[in-house]
Amino acid sequence: MAPTFSARRGHNSTRGMDLYEWQRGCIDLGKTGTSVIVRAPTSAGKSRVCDAILMHRLKQLGGVALVVLPFVALCDERSEQIAVGLTGTDIRLVRMYGGQGGALHNWQRDTIVVCTPERANQFLTQAIELKRSRKIVFAVIDEAHMLRDRQRGGAMQGILTKLRMCESEAQVLCMSATMKDRFMTTLATWLGAVTYSTAFRPVRLHVYVKRGNVLYVDETPSRELSGGRDIDHIAQLTNETIEMGGSVLVFCQSKISCETTARALRPLITTASKIGVHNSDLSSSDRVDMEEAFRAGSVRVICCTSTLAMGVNLPARRVIIRGVHRNTSDGMIQQMIGRAGRAGLDAEGDAIIFDEHCQYTTTPDDDRVHMHESAATRLVVETIASGLVKTSDDVHRLIDCAFASDARSRVHDAVKWCQENGLIAWNETSETWSATKLGSGLSSSTMSPELVSPLLHRIQRLQRGAVLSSALQVIYLLVPERVGGDVCVTPRELVSDMCEEDVEAARRIGVRPFDARFVYAVALNDIIEERSTEHKFGVSVGDIEQARDACVRTGMDLCVVCESIGYGTVASVIGRITNRLISGSKESTLELTRIPHIGALRARYLARHGIRTPEDILNLGSVDALFAILKKMSRNVTDGILIKSASNIFTAVKKMLVEKAQDISDLIVVGGKRKYPEIT
């Protein structure tokens, strides 16, 4: 059984650095080099613990540290935090998520890689192939309760299984706010780790269950609410929080419920506070703007879906859980509750659960973890392609190293499926397994194995008759089978407004009635051709953006797979269009849109002024010169905002060019003594 540590007390300050006592104890434990499974409430300070142990490990051994988070928004947030801590050091920060980052070339330089589970899994496979896995000295898995998740869990399990199998000396840190006891103990035993658990929260939390007009605490009536026009009492609960200077998150069952709740609240809020909506109908930039407005206090109430609790750290004084889906887990409810109370701003926070509208499932404290078919298939292909698995004995060792209770049957079934589908081959003479070219390509991508065959079939059709002057066919190839929400236009309506090249591309696609994939493909094609899409397709900006993100992931993966099987020309075409989907622009402005704070519209304006590359921006000579150009473009934006944008662009360009130079000189090792942030 794994050793267990527990922290119950509060705050400790030593050597000029404020740390909670549980943080001090956990950091001291982590500095011994042992792997640790940490459970601590939201806002307890897990990230600070992670950073201290990580930096100690890099200072002690040097090498590469993986920071794995389940969502791109969390990766963005963590990257910014880590970047601040690395100021003045020689440690490199690499972002591998959301279309950013590629292979790591300079393994001699100390590096922190922030990545999603899928990219971390891909990175580790490449490291094993290159015999560089021993360079990975630290790996943190944040939100580790998601090891059981059907989508992200497989990649997380794959990372840890391969670290065990390649006999890596990497120290592992798994962190969660909602991991249950038996699962935590089983995970620690599997990894040879110790557990560290604390219930300490820097902000006191009060949890109420609302039934009718009464709030209960542990089945005991605590308070009766008044009635009036506010039938559900949401306005009353919101108003009293705003009057105390606080903010409110209202979790709703659906996107429609978010909108209707916000509309109902607006006339009932007694102050001039703004009410916002946060759901997948918004574009990512609109969601970021809403989050920033909430943090700044210009928006005091957000009506949101449960995804906000998972994808972004946005605490509030009060959390109201008005409704959730029937299949919502109690772990997700805990994530929502954990948003109550803002450390450093509130002395306490409270969460109110509407019992009559919240039917969620109670997850049993079960130590069993299952391996899904797709995850098992990827694990088999990756371990064979990387050379970890060669013989039948190695297959058994893979099973022994896996976490899932059903690993034996899943792995054997996956080996059979991979062989039947041409991903791996058995050599009767040497009695060894090897990956085919297709299997190697799949291993180097993040693609689901079951998608490879149908996508290659589509590519072969594309090769027989592609309209090279239009991107529509390639985009249609990339759009997933199940895409977005309902569409309000038919493909035939859209064809009537198309240019000649796109009409021919549509003819070769074979337009079918009610083909949502085609509608989304046309929308995305209009975006990269810089045409207006407003109100044209009857779908939300958020749905179009999600379709674009799915196309980008598929496009990046297909480039890798196509290169591996000799379809280099196809890979080049798909790669160019994928890059345009990332930027939302024509090829002429592609390089500019890779710069942070420069979107497609701003890139087009700069290009008209002869600025087409990062070097052109730097050659302007000053922030003031760039500000003058931006001011001509943005007449309705204040000078202060534009100066900040110009400064941010200049800083980003300098950083990009430095990193570009470092990539070119991969073999040059940074000389002199390493510099590290001070750690207590």
Residue ranges and their predicted role:
Residues 161, 173, 177-263, 358:
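Conserved interdomain linker/interface between the two RecA-like ATPase lobes of SF2 helicase motors
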Residues 118-121, 128-172:
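SF2 helicase catalytic motif II
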Residues 47-48, 63-84, 121, 177-183, ...:
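Conserved Walker A/P-loop ATP-binding site and its immediately adjacent core
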